[in-house]
């Protein structure tokens, strides 16, 4: 799987790798043409992010993988052709504990009513 994910070899050390799949055909049945390309990706991405939060809360390390050879991942996992591989999520016990990265100040990323107007709490 690490080779299929552009040689991101840490994937091979993960205890488990979750593949998020979507069904583009399902969206065609439910939505008009302007929205069809969204839900088959959006719903699995929401689920993956919830898994990231849950795993982190439990002390596991995760890394959302979006760079991969979809055909190769589908071959390895025997995913039906009609489904799309949206993301990979390796989960495991981290082998390091780096300090948190610096974050932008709240006022630089949250705005009130229009971009550039800081949200005051």
Task: List where the protein language model places each region.
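Short, well-ordered secondary-structure micro-motifs
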Residues: 1-2, 29-31, 75, 98-102
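Glycine/small-residue-rich phosphate/adenosyl-binding loop
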Residues: 1-47
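Glycine-rich, flexible loop/turn motifs
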Residues: 7, 64, 75, 102-106, ...
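A glycine-rich helix N-cap at a beta->alpha junction
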Residues: 8-14, 78-100
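Generic structural "secondary-structure junction" signal
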Residues: 12-13, 48, 81, 108-112
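Small-aliphatic-rich amphipathic alpha-helix that forms the alpha element of a beta-alpha
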Residues: 18, 33-76
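Short, charged/polar surface micro-motifs in flexible loops or helix N-caps
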Residues: 23-27, 70-71, 95
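C-terminal helix-cap and adjacent tail motif
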Residues: 88-121
């Amino acid at each position: 799987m690490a080779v299929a994910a552009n040689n991101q070899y840490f994937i091979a050390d993960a205890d488990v790798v979750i593949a998020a799949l979507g069904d583009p055909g399902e969206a065609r049945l439910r939505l008009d043409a302007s929205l069809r390309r969204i839900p088959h990706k959006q719903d699995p991405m929401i689920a993956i992010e919830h898994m990231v939060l849950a795993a982190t809360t439990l002390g596991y390390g995760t890394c959302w993988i979006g760079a991969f050879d979809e055909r190769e991942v589908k071959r390895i996992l025997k995913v039906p052709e009609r489904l799309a591989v949206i993301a990979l999520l390796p989960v495991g016990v981290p082998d390091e504990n780096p300090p948190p990265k610096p974050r932008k100040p709240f006022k630089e990323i949250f705005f009130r009513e229009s971009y550039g107007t800081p949200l005051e709490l």
